[in-house]
A protein has these predicted regions:
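N-terminal interaction/assembly modules
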Residues: 1-102, 153-169
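Generic alpha-helical hydrophobic packing signal
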Residues: 14, 28, 106, 124-127
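Generic recognition of cysteine residues
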Residues: 34, 55, 131-132, 137
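Short, conserved sequence motifs enriched in acidic/basic residues, glycine, and aromatics
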Residues: 103-104, 131
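Short amphipathic alpha helix immediately N-terminal
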Residues: 104-121
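Helix-turn-helix DNA-binding module
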Residues: 119-136
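DNA major-groove recognition helices of helix-turn-helix
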Residues: 137-151
Length: 169
């Protein structure tokens, strides 16, 4: 059996495509929420006159310090979210563009990969969706995965057999 780590990685990316896409959307939403919270203008509380004496209830951290720490925490979250996005978003963009290119080259192969790996459909359902037999669907899935892997990681990811020529002397 032929084994290639790049093909296994592409298969895993396809299987988790919806999960990764939703994660990217959620992280972008979290970044927007943190930025909106940073844009809010913080105003310190006004001193109040209380009939009871004291210095404010023994609170050790002032409200201004709490707001400053909250801003620092929000900025730290934004940096973490952006680092997470920098890891996964280029990969998903590359997968999207490679799938679009595969669809332009061979729509049947793109349908097979989408149905079988992204939608997690059975081979029978995939064959109906791609309008081909189950056996043909399985064979084409292997070649389509190799093609998609080559598109994503370059020609070195899927080694091709070159011609072997023997010369007589």
């Amino acid at each position: 059996m032929y084994h290639n780590d790049y093909i296994d990685a592409v298969t895993e990316y396809l299987r988790r495509y919806r999960e990764f896409s939703q994660y990217i959307a959620n992280v972008k939403t979290d970044i927007d929420e943190c930025q909106r919270m940073l844009e809010l203008e913080a105003s310190p509380a006004a001193s109040s006159m209380s009939p009871t004496g004291g210095c404010g209830g023994g609170e050790k951290v002032s409200q201004e310090e709490r707001m400053y720490m909250q801003r620092e925490d929000l900025q730290r979250k934004i940096r973490k979210y952006r680092a997470d996005l920098q890891q996964i978003e280029p990969l998903i963009r590359r997968l999207d563009s490679s799938m679009a290119s595969l669809k332009d080259i061979n729509e049947t192969d793109a349908r097979i990969l989408e149905s079988r790996y992204i939608d997690d459909a059975s081979w029978e359902s995939t064959a109906r969706y791609a309008c081909c037999s189950v056996g043909s669907c399985r064979r084409r899935a292997r070649t389509a995965l190799k093609t998609l892997t080559g598109m994503m990681f370059g020609p070195d990811a899927v080694p091709m057999q070159t011609s072997v020529v023997f010369f007589k002397r």
